[in-house]
């Protein structure tokens, strides 16, 4: 399992990055979600790595 936490605001981000955050379910700062570890989730995290913290 991977835990992803939004630590920076998405204001000023590109629309693609906003869509990725929506798909991950991260809408507010300090919002945290758990996901299965797979390539799709890793790719989404890579798109917004400057906005989130990842722990395993």
Curated annotation (Swiss-Prot):
InterPro entries assigned to the protein according to its UniProt record, in alphabetical order: Ribo_uL30_ferredoxin-like_sf, Ribosomal_uL30_bac-type, Ribosomal_uL30_ferredoxin-like
GO BP annotations, alphabetical order: translation
Keywords for this protein: Ribonucleoprotein, Ribosomal protein
CC annotations in GO: large ribosomal subunit
Organism of provenance: Nitratidesulfovibrio vulgaris (strain DSM 19637 / Miyazaki F)
Gene Ontology MF, one: structural constituent of ribosome
Family: Belongs to the universal ribosomal protein uL30 family.
Pfam families with a match to the protein in the record: Ribosomal_L30 (PF00327)
Annotated signal peptide: none
Protein name: Large ribosomal subunit protein uL30
Assembly: Part of the 50S ribosomal subunit.
């Amino acid at each position: 399992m991977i835990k992803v936490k939004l630590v920076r605001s998405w204001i000023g981000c590109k629309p693609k990055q906003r869509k990725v955050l929506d798909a991950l379910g991260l809408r507010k700062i300090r919002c945290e979600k758990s996901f299965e570890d797979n390539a799709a989730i890793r790719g989404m995290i890579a798109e917004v790595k400057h906005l989130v913290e990842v722990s395993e």
